[in-house]
Amino acid sequence: KIMLSAYGKTHASHGNFNNYLGVPLCLASMPNDTEYAVIEMGMSAKGELSELSKLAIPDVALITAVSEGHIESFNSVEEIADAKCEIFEGMDINEGIAIVNRDITTYERCLQNIDRAGMQNVQTFGKKVDAGVRFVSSEILEDDTLRLSYSTDGEALELVIPLIPAHLAGHFAGAFAVVKALKLDPDAASAAISSFIPLIGRGALLKVKNG
C-alpha cells in the first residue's frame, strides 16, 4: 500500500481481513475514487481463493510464499501451491498479470497451474538470478539504517530505510514486481518506502549490553 500510494489513492485490507468475510468487507468499503486496491487473500482449504479471486477480479495477483502453514487441510506442500494458485482464477487470462516468488520450492508447480489456467502474463521476483525483480543485497549502515539493492530486468534500484526484519526486504521485491507490472516509475515507490517503519512490536531495534 505504501508504494502504490505514491501513484494515487490506494485502498487496502485492514488487519487480517483476508478470508471469505474480510475480503467482501474490504471490497464493499472501497471508496469510489480509489485508483489502486491492495486486497490480501488468505486460505485454509481448497476452493477458498478461487471464490475470493472471482469476487475481486484482480488485475495483478501475487503469490508471496507457499509453506506448510495450512498442511492440516492438505496432503502436501504441492497441494497447498495448487490451492494458492486459485488466486489467478478470477483474472482476465490475456490482460491479468500473475506474479510468483521465484525462490519458493513449488515454483515449477505454480507455473504448471498458471499454464493450465491459460494466463498469458507471468512475472517473478526473488533472490534467484533469473527473477524479473531481484533482491540483490542488504547492508547495515553506521547510522542504523539499511541499504537495500534490487535489480529490475537488469536495472539497479537502491534505497536506504530504517532497519527491518530480513524477510521484509524480500517482500519489497514482490511489491516492486507489482509496480513493474503496472508500468509505474519504480523511483516513486522507492522514495515512498524509504520512510517505512514496521508495526509496533515488529522489527524494533533493541540495544543490549555486551554479554
Q: For each predicted feature, which ranges?
A:
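Adenine nucleotide phosphate-binding catalytic loops in nucleotide-utilizing enzymes
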Residues: 78, 116-211
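Phosphate-binding loop of NTP-binding sites
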Residues: 1-102, 108-119, 173, 182
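Heptad-repeat coiled-coil segments of the DHp/HisKA dimerization-phosphoacceptor module
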Residues: 103-104, 152
